[in-house]
């Protein structure tokens, strides 16, 4: 018989609700690319949620069952194939039994989380991601736990990691890169408006939805900072901005640097400051030693150069990223912006 979930207090620090999100890294896992069977499963399930006999399915305006007000146990899910494996646990394709809604169930082992001392990162990921709702941000619907494991109920991104797609293609064309830049800019405008800094934008932390739309994931390094000023080192070396490697106070403008690095990597196939040693990478970042191969279009060079500025206050604002002539000329965004944008 399955262990009974949700009878034990949150094991890390102050107590948190045992299940439900209406009370309020380490890279953990990777997701595989979509398979035909998964697409069929989604088309049969997520487009037409059905209820168990005598059970009404409550949906929100987006057609997603309202998971945030329910308590869950592992017995509420049919578990499918693994989507990814990591040092803290695994991610599985899963279907909630009452609604037949397809999700990605991230199963984390408490022992591993405690061993690595990343309890605070997990808590931060849950508290931040659960309260973000944007078409280009991966949803965290709810969580629950038992004696040994913590379960995160996540939106399923059928086309998997942007990182794996980039590995397969080597580089992206202007249309795809510009579309990603517009999606990222819109999602980060939303995050920054809620005083959330992601701090770890990179291909491994970006997923692709059913129509290829971008989904920002992995908020383990992100922070909800009302002051929007931090001084801790985090993120991935190739994507770290000068103010972080120099130990200076940083704010939400670190994300502007990150999307500049990402834009370069998508078009070129490697990050702009990648070097044979960490010390050389640090040196190149500090000097903003930016060199473009001839293959990078002039418009993209202009955008990247305006984002990769040593002084954070000189970096191009997100609204101007969306409105940049190169982005406007090439972006073919699938989903509409979350709100009208204006260029300051």
UniProtKB/Swiss-Prot annotation:
* TM helices/strands, residue ranges: none
Enzyme Commission number: 2.7.11.1
Ranges where the Protein kinase domain occurs:
77-327
Activity control, as annotated, is: Activity is greatly increased when AURKB is within the CPC complex. In particular, AURKB-phosphorylated INCENP acts as an activator of AURKB. Positive feedback between HASPIN and AURKB contributes to CPC localization.
Keyword match Transcription regulation:
no
Q: Name one GO biological process term.
A: cellular response to UV
Top enzyme class, one word, equals transferase
Residues the record lists as Phosphothreonine modifications: 35, 64, 232
Subcellular location field = Nucleus; Chromosome; Chromosome, Centromere; Chromosome, Centromere, Kinetochore
Q: Which residues carry this modification: N6-acetyllysine?
A: 215
Keyword set, alphabetical order: Acetylation, ATP-binding, Cell cycle, Cell division, Centromere, Chromosome, Cytoplasm, Cytoskeleton, Kinase, Kinetochore, Mitosis, Nucleotide-binding, Nucleus, Phosphoprotein, Serine/threonine-protein kinase, Transferase, Ubl conjugation
Q: What does this protein do?
A: Serine/threonine-protein kinase component of the chromosomal passenger complex (CPC), a complex that acts as a key regulator of mitosis. The CPC complex has essential functions at the centromere in ensuring correct chromosome alignment and segregation and is required for chromatin-induced microtubule stabilization and spindle assembly. Involved in the bipolar attachment of spindle microtubules to kinetochores and is a key regulator for the onset of cytokinesis during mitosis. Required for central/midzone spindle assembly and cleavage furrow formation.
The protein here is known as Aurora kinase B
Biological source species:
Sus scrofa (Pig)
